[in-house]
UniProtKB/Swiss-Prot annotation:
One of its GO terms (molecular function) is mRNA (nucleoside-2'-O-)-methyltransferase activity. It catalyses: a 5'-end (N(7)-methyl 5'-triphosphoguanosine)-(2'-O-methyl-ribonucleoside)-(ribonucleotide) in mRNA + S-adenosyl-L-methionine = a 5'-end (N(7)-methyl 5'-triphosphoguanosine)-(2'-O-methyl-ribonucleoside)-(2'-O-methyl-ribonucleotide) in mRNA + S-adenosyl-L-homocysteine + H(+). The active site is at K117, D234, K274 (proton acceptor). Induction: Induced by the branchless FGF pathway in migrating tracheal cells, resulting of the switch from the intersegmental to the segmental nerve. Probable S-adenosyl-L-methionine-dependent methyltransferase that mediates mRNA cap2 2'-O-ribose methylation to the 5'-cap structure of mRNAs. May methylate the ribose of the second nucleotide of a m(7)GpppG-capped mRNA (cap0) to produce m(7)GpppRmpNm (cap2). Regulates expression of tracheal genes required for pathfinding on the segmental nerve. It is found in: Nucleus. The gene is cmtr2. Its EC number is 2.1.1.296. SUPFAM superfamilies: S-adenosyl-L-methionine-dependent methyltransferases. This is Cap-specific mRNA (nucleoside-2'-O-)-methyltransferase 2. Keywords: Methyltransferase, mRNA capping, mRNA processing, Nucleus, S-adenosyl-L-methionine, Transferase.
Length: 700
């Protein structure tokens, strides 16, 4: 039996489940749209200088009608559990076998769904037309576009022909001020290619800051001598909390990506940017802009893009950088982006400035992609509710056909290991543990958000219990000193971390639960352990920042005090009690103390949760003086780390530190979420009059 789509998008059985019409596979690979530009005097033009930009707010009624239709279908998913629904759509994804085969049969480098999608785009459009190419990749983490482009180049050209230089930027996973739920923290590719990544002067990697766009332009001028042939932009923002407002939420990011690309791309260059629904007038004006300054603009939804989501790739070919009206346009966009509170939902152009024939074509494109998405959602609902075994058999056959078509159409072949950018073993290591937490449906999450505190605590406890099952806290951990060369300082500076939002020195599920507890109780679990450092006769308490202080200020103050006391008292040992080293600043100072100041270190994973450094070195004083001088002078920018990132990541030291931090944070969770506990703020204590203080008992 085969299937055909009903008007509602539900598959109806026909006569033979095993027969699949060629059009069913073809439809997956042909979700394309090409804007047809008029020629001559009727060609689409940017508004002249005497016409204002961002001058009025309006919407297009027909497009808003399409938006309402799409949201009506998407709202049918409100009562499905997010994990359960995601697992269901993954099983139903007809392209699901493609990435599996690329990983396991072809053994391609760093395969993700993004890898598969870019590989399609490169084969379907002339984004790269010669073996000598300079490419810039925006919002690129974890790096799959780069690995995919490398595979494409080596599949199409001989090794000796290829002259490829690439650089990339993304939200910096090593900068603790970047929110963990707004960035990709997978650094398996990044850590081995750090010299190719721009995180800008503030180290955030945040393209929404126009100063970082300026820095990006400067760096590209130096690195590529102004010749950038290809720019890709794969950014997005999590819109799970407001699924009906995705387009408005991401519009600032789109403008930042487009502004960056148009400033760094060379004349004749190509641009690929991921977008979502295109119903809003601000998106219409952005697409019209791209059509005015590129020879060709296409919209493409790859076969490996999940059918039920809104993502599409806008592909722009042959950039006209010398367009006379372009500089004013870029300056206006930059000015708008420089205002953090400006949502940029105001359309770039007035309504009369957008030609009717462009709007007609744009509406056709929007209708097509909206219909594809609603059909996919309706089909998924039907499959979920019916549990039709014959349909599942049909789907299994379809997945195999789609994978075969992908391999045949794009001439997929394996590459020699020597042609990979990073050693495959390094990028194939597991990211960590996954926690099977029930996320609930959208309706349940909304109800919980506005529900009573006890329900929220119950959900947090349930998540904590799942975390405890996944973590093995009884495994001992240690750091064995085996360094043959001295530890070299390598100072990195950037914007001070205002609040601790992420860390590479604790497991991601733990950090996410910490943020949820913080949202619920408005108390930060990381301070609930009352961290302190014992220097034989003296104790230093690590105090949280005051209301008006940055997190960086608090950590800077503590570590300067600590190093001053070690220098003055020369204690033969120091003991950190329930002390979290979650930032590169703290971790680099710890490694400095271990390697340059003390001879021995011992992680104690029992209930005390201590870290002891002992046997003060004879050369400690000079090392301490050098580092103290650096810590006190931040005129050139706040210190992010004293050591090279590679000294602190993906090694025995980082593994021990992650286990140490995980153990302490879990203890804090246990105290805050226990049956008899209710969180209470820690009373601040001054270090000035502390000689020796007792363990704080009831801080919860």
């Amino acid at each position: 039996m085969s299937f055909r789509s009903s008007p509602q998008g539900k598959p109806h059985p026909m006569t033979d489940y095993q027969s699949i019409r060629p059009s069913e596979v073809e439809q997956l690979f042909e979700k394309k749209f090409h804007y047809q530009k008029p020629k001559g005097n009727k060609s689409w033009q940017l508004p002249p200088p005497d016409q204002a930009l961002f001058s009025e707010f309006y919407q297009f009624e027909a497009l808003q009608g399409l938006r309402e239709q799409l949201n009506a279908v998407k709202s049918k998913l409100n009562d499905y559990g997010v994990q359960e629904w995601s697992a269901h759509t993954n099983r139903r994804d007809p392209s699901g076998e493609v990435s599996w085969r690329l990983k396991n049969d072809t053994k391609a480098e760093f395969v993700t769904v993004a890898w598969c999608k870019l590989f399609e785009c490169l084969h379907r459009y002339p984004l790269v037309t010669k073996p000598a190419v300079n490419s810039m990749h925006l919002c690129e983490a974890p790096g799959a576009f780069i690995a995919s482009l490398n595979h494409y180049l080596h599949s199409k050209y001989e090794k000796d022909e290829i002259k490829w230089r690439w650089r990339s930027t993304t939200l910096n996973p090593y900068y603790e001020g970047n929110a963990i739920n707004q960035m990709i923290s997978d650094d398996r590719f990044i850590v081995h290619t750090l010299d190719n990544w721009f995180f800008h002067k503030d180290l955030t990697g945040n393209l929404l800051d126009v100063a970082n766009i300026d820095h990006l332009v400067e760096r590209c001028e130096v690195e590529f001598q102004g010749q950038v042939d290809l720019v890709t932009a794969d950014g997005s923002i999590d819109c799970a909390a407001q699924p009906d407002c995705q387009e408005e939420i991401v519009v600032r990011l789109f403008f930042a990506e487009v502004l960056s690309a148009l400033r760094i791309l060379s004349s004749g260059g190509n641009f690929l940017v991921k977008m979502f629904t295109l119903f809003e007038a601000c998106s219409v004006s952005l697409l019209y802009t791209l059509n005015c300054i590129f020879e060709e603009v296409h919209i493409f939804k790859p076969a490996t893009s999940k059918r039920g989501n809104s993502e599409v790739y806008v592909i722009c070919l042959n950039y006209n950088k010398d367009h006379p009206d372009l500089p004013r346009l870029l300056e206006e966009i930059k000015s708008k982006l420089a205002q953090p509170n400006d949502t940029l939902v105001m359309p770039l152009f007035a309504k009369f400035q957008i030609p009717h024939d462009f709007l007609m074509q744009h509406e056709i494109a929007c209708r097509m992609y909206m219909k594809l998405q609603t059909d996919a959602i309706e089909g998924s609902i039907y499959a979920y509710e019916s549990n039709d075994r014959h349909y599942l058999r049909h789907l299994h056959h379809l997945r195999s056909l789609v994978a075969n078509t992908y391999y045949s159409l794009y001439k997929v072949k394996p590459l020699e290991d020597s042609l990979c950018i990073v050693d495959k073993e390094a990028t194939s290591k597991a990211l960590g543990f996954q926690v099977p937490v029930y996320g609930g449906s959208y309706t349940e999450r909304e109800s919980l958000k506005h529900g009573d505190l006890l329900k929220q605590i119950y959900c947090l406890r349930r998540e904590f219990n799942q975390l405890e099952k996944c973590l093995n806290n009884r495994t001992p951990y240690s750091y064995v000193k085996n360094r043959t060369a001295p530890l070299n300082l390598h100072i990195s500076r950037g914007a001070p971390v205002q609040s601790l939002q992420s860390s590479m020195f604790a497991s991601e599920p733990i950090l996410i639960l910490r943020l949820r507890i913080l949202d619920t109780f408005e108390l930060d679990p990381v301070w609930q352990s009352a961290p302190k450092c014992q220097l034989e006769s003296k104790t230093l308490c690590y105090l949280p920042p005051t209301e008006d202080e940055a997190f960086h200020t608090a950590q800077q103050r503590f570590f300067i005090d600590l190093l001053e006391e070690v220098k003055k008292l020369k204690p033969d040992s120091i003991v950190f009690h329930k002390f979290l080293f979650l930032t590169h600043y703290a971790a680099s100072l710890l490694l400095f103390l271990i390697e340059s100041v003390y001879q021995d270190c011992c992680f104690n994973s029992n209930q005390a949760q201590t870290l002891t450094l002992s046997k003060l070195k004879d050369t400690a004083n000079s090392a301490l003086e050098q580092v103290l001088e650096l810590l006190k002078d931040e005129q050139a920018g706040a210190i992010h780390s004293l050591l090279d990132i590679k000294e602190l990541q993906k090694n025995q030291f980082s593994k021990a530190l992650i286990q140490h931090n995980n153990s302490i944070v879990m203890t804090c969770f246990r105290s805050m979420l226990g049956e008899e506990s209710f969180p209470m703020p820690v009373a601040p204590t001054s270090n000035s009059d502390v000689g020796s203080i007792q363990e704080s008992a009831a801080v919860f």
